[in-house]
A protein has these predicted regions:
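Short sequence/structural segments immediately N-terminal
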Residues: 3, 22-319
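Bacterial N-terminal signal peptides
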Residues: 8-19
Length: 319
């Protein structure tokens, strides 16, 4: 009887052992973490390609996450590359992402969007200016590095400036947003993956984007200044200018681009010729010698509860 029990136990053990591989195969995903990667790292090791293995320090190389892709998830099956046994360099993988790649941007982006397509920030990629100009994800993003420079505020702008050279120049002017200081990033105003706003703005309009930080300019005011409601870029260049407050040009020249000349508020100040000054926009050339400009009186440019955006205490102007 004892011998019979031992034989039955042995048969049961062998039966389970025989069925285990097939059952595991049925439960195991086709492309689990590091499946097939061992083949890649047999050549692309620390001695041959140390920079490639830095991906292990990123989300793309987190073994504990079942969503983590394998090499072939991005580079394709690449059978010719993997199975090559010749003395020369093997053929390239099916999908490559380097600066010299001949793979179309659309094919490279498709590899990324296999995972990154359910994010609201990327919902407007199709038809965006970057997509229609064949910008690839890897034109901006670096995958095989411990930290992607475009995600870090301190280094993001340098990535953008590789293409947007005019904005780099403007950002070096005296009046600018603090990108160079690392306090802001291009993505604070722009969504590089596409948006419904102009110039890839994060909001639906320029003013709505600006108001996310400059709420005090929004109002409501009894008397609003129309450009503030329409487009901040009418007066400002957000990337940088040589004029205070990032104005495109200084008052009164900026004001005169929309507003015509008018009489001084105190005729007693008038002592010059009665022709409108081309410099000040006033019917009084003496204002120039007083160091006045439009904003000396109309100080509440963005909106005011006073007529014409006048200073709440105009008597201070003439002390």
């Amino acid at each position: 009887m004892k011998l019979l029990r031992q034989l039955l136990a042995l048969c049961a053990f062998l039966s389970v052992a025989a069925s285990t591989p097939s059952s595991l195969a049925a439960e195991t995903p086709k492309d689990i973490v590091l499946t097939g990667d061992a083949i890649c790292t047999s050549c692309h090791d620390e001695a041959d390609s140390p920079e490639l293995l830095a991906i292990g320090k990123t989300r793309h190389g987190t073994r504990a996450d079942k969503r983590t892709p394998s090499c072939t998830s991005c580079h394709g099956q690449s059978k010719d590359h993997i199975n090559y046994k010749g003395p020369a360099k093997p053929p390239k993988p099916d999908v490559t992402f380097g600066a010299k790649t001949k793979v179309a941007a659309e094919a490279r982006n498709d590899a990324c969007q296999e995972c990154h397509k359910k994010d609201a920030k990327r919902s407007h990629w199709e038809g965006s200016i970057h997509q229609t100009r064949d910008v690839a994800c890897t034109s901006c993003h670096k995958i095989h590095v411990a930290k992607d420079p475009v995600i870090d505020k301190r280094t993001q702008s340098e990535t953008c400036f590789n293409c947007h050279k005019e904005q780099r120049s403007q950002g070096s002017k005296p009046s600018h947003h603090p990108l160079a200081e690392g306090k802001m990033a291009c993505s604070d105003c722009h969504n590089a993956h596409g948006s419904v706003g102009p110039s890839l703005m994060t909001r639906n309009s320029v003013v709505e984007t600006c108001y996310t930080c400059h709420m005090e300019k929004r109002g409501p005011f009894v008397r609003s200044h129309q450009p503030v409601q329409e487009d901040c870029a009418i007066c400002h260049n957000a990337h940088g200018t040589t004029t205070e407050s990032m104005l495109k040009t200084r008052p009164p020249f900026l004001c005169n681009s929309c507003h015509g000349p008018h009489m001084p508020i105190q005729p007693a100040l008038s002592s010059g010729p009665k022709a409108a000054s081309a410099v000040t926009g006033w019917w009084d050339a003496s204002v120039i010698t007083q160091g006045k400009s439009c904003v000396s009186c109309h100080s509440q440019i963005h909106g005011s509860n006073n007529p014409s955006g006048l200073n709440p205490n105009p008597q201070r102007l003439f002390r």
